[in-house]
Amino acid sequence: MPDSTFLDSTELVLNMGPQHPSTHGVLRVILKLDGEKVLGTDCIIGYLHRGVEKIAENRTYAQFNPYVDRMDYVAAVSNGLGYCLAIEKLLNVEAPPRAQCIRVILTELNRIASHLLWLGTHALDIGAITPVFYCLREREEALKIFEKYCGARLTTHAFRIGGLLYETYDGFEQEIRDFCKMFIPKVDEYEELLTNNRIWVGRLKDVGILSADECKEFGVTGPVLRAAGVKWDLRKAQPYSGYEKYDFEIPTRVNGDTYDRYIVRMEEMRQSVRIMQQAVDGIPEGPIMGKVGKVIKPPIGEAYVSIEAPKGELGYYAVSDGSTQPYRIRVRPPSFVNLQALDRMIRGGLIADVVAVIGTLDIVLGEIDR
């Protein structure tokens, strides 16, 4: 007879990444397993570290602006907005109303583009191949608008400290209206494919649960927090760029599982369209740049500004020593904070669920490692 200890369960350590397609970047996850059950995880980050915050200390305020696009490169517009708002707060200036309105339109369009890439790749990770083609089809239309506006599709560098560099092109407003009209039926189309699909629901429902209290404990923000039932969105709670003028809802769920995070992001895309429609119909006339000198030299002081990026609260802490270069720039990236909750979400689950949970965190390693 074989030794019975051969059949006893033993702990297995499995390396997932850093080169793994479902981590969407160079993330290494060390999984401790008992058969198919996950006993714990340990995330190893830093493979994409570029020293962005240190680079800021050796650049002028304007020179550092393009660097922030390279953190969450999927939502570069939001990164640029947060940075510009922080430096504008240091300077005690405000972008003109026209610039603020255009900023809102482009930021919400970028939110949709970010969520589309998340949805397509998340579905692909789980085994649904069709949605990624549909999502990339609509995302391409959004990227075309960015390209026509500023010449870039991904790392746009669309905003400037004090406002905008570029005025809208002829037909910009109509293209935004056409996109909004086209896009809402497409979201319904995605939901027809996935929301009530038995396989999709089976893979996501009651998987990776994170309660509201646990979200607060970890400092989790964005769709992950709202899926747990916490109605917190900085566009409503601490309005910036004129968001208080727009009528929109904050989508929330109650279970805090992987399925609820999917539902929240789907509804967020609809709300982004709603904001864009109101903004494009109310673009005021006027200048697109505030009273900012060619040489940006804020007075000695500090400022912190946070915005609602597609992945959660994105914050910039800027310290000025009175020179043309920042003394310190500190970034509070939502992906970095949200990733800390991964172990709590996966522990006790199955190894097959790891990919699904990482997918609904919607992390970008450029933002985490900086």
Swiss-Prot record:
Disulfide bonds: none annotated. Its main location: membrane. Keywords: Cell inner membrane, Cell membrane, Membrane, NAD, Quinone, Translocase, Transport, Ubiquinone. It is found in: Cell inner membrane. It catalyses: a quinone + NADH + 5 H(+)(in) = a quinol + NAD(+) + 4 H(+)(out). GO terms for molecular function: NAD binding; NADH:ubiquinone reductase (non-electrogenic) activity; quinone binding. It comes from the Bacteria. It is a peripheral membrane protein. It holds the Pfam family Complex1_49kDa. NDH-1 shuttles electrons from NADH, via FMN and iron-sulfur (Fe-S) centers, to quinones in the respiratory chain. The immediate electron acceptor for the enzyme in this species is believed to be ubiquinone. Couples the redox reaction to proton translocation (for every two electrons transferred, four hydrogen ions are translocated across the cytoplasmic membrane), and thus conserves the redox energy in a proton gradient. PANTHER family: NADH DEHYDROGENASE [UBIQUINONE] IRON-SULFUR PROTEIN 2, MITOCHONDRIAL (PTHR11993:SF10), NADH-UBIQUINONE OXIDOREDUCTASE 49 KDA SUBUNIT (PTHR11993). Belongs to the complex I 49 kDa subunit family. NDH-1 is composed of 14 different subunits. Subunits NuoB, C, D, E, F, and G constitute the peripheral sector of the complex. This is NADH-quinone oxidoreductase subunit D 2.
